[in-house]
């Protein structure tokens, strides 16, 4: 094992520990809320900039609308997370939630490493590094990346009408 493998293991362990303490339902709801928030933001951000009538500069007006939306979004997310915590405590599924959260964290850590590795290979000469070539985990990550890219290419590029 070399440096890349050690970093990979550390990232996966940190992700698993964080997800263990947060729990599966909170992790899942967090991802769902972030996706919905980003979609709503890109669809309606111009609507929020209308409320900034005191600012004449369009760029500054958009920045203010981004900040206002982000603050409201974080407020809504914290309320939703609190409701999920209460639900978990009332149902008594805390241990199962934490165990599934740990597995979710492992998967999230592997996906994060695959994304980072993909962009390192795409944008840099990192693939020619001796640590990269001698890594134990990199071939497995690359295999997963190739499967995902092949699937996405077939699904969204070749059959797009």
From Swiss-Prot:
Key words of the record: Cell membrane, Membrane, Transmembrane, Transmembrane helix
Membrane-protein topology: Multi-pass membrane protein
Gene Ontology CC annotations of this record: plasma membrane
Record's subcellular location: Cell membrane
Source domain of life: Bacteria
Keyword Cell membrane tagged: yes
Transmembrane feature ranges: 7-26, 31-53, 66-88, 101-123, 136-153
Biological process per Gene Ontology, one example term: toxin biosynthetic process
Pfam families noted in UniProt: Colicin_V
Keyword Cell membrane: yes
Similarity remark: To E.coli CvpA.
Name of this protein: Colicin V production protein homolog
Gene: cvpA
């Amino acid at each position: 094992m070399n440096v890349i493998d050690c970093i990979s293991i550390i990232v996966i362990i940190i992700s698993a520990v964080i997800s263990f303490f947060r729990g599966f339902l909170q992790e899942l709801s967090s991802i769902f809320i972030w996706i919905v928030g980003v979609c709503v933001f890109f669809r309606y951000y111009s609507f929020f900039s209308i409320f900034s009538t005191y600012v004449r500069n369009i760029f500054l007006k958009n920045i203010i609308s981004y900040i206002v939306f982000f603050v409201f979004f974080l407020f809504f997310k914290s309320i939703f997370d609190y409701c999920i915590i209460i639900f978990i405590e009332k149902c008594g599924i805390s241990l199962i939630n934490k165990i599934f959260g740990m597995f979710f964290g492992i998967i999230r850590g592997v996906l994060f490493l695959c994304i980072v590795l993909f962009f390192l290979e795409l944008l840099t000469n990192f693939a020619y590094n001796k640590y990269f070539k001698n890594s134990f985990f990199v071939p497995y990550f690359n295999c997963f990346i190739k499967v995902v890219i092949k699937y996405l290419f077939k699904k969204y590029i070749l059959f797009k009408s």
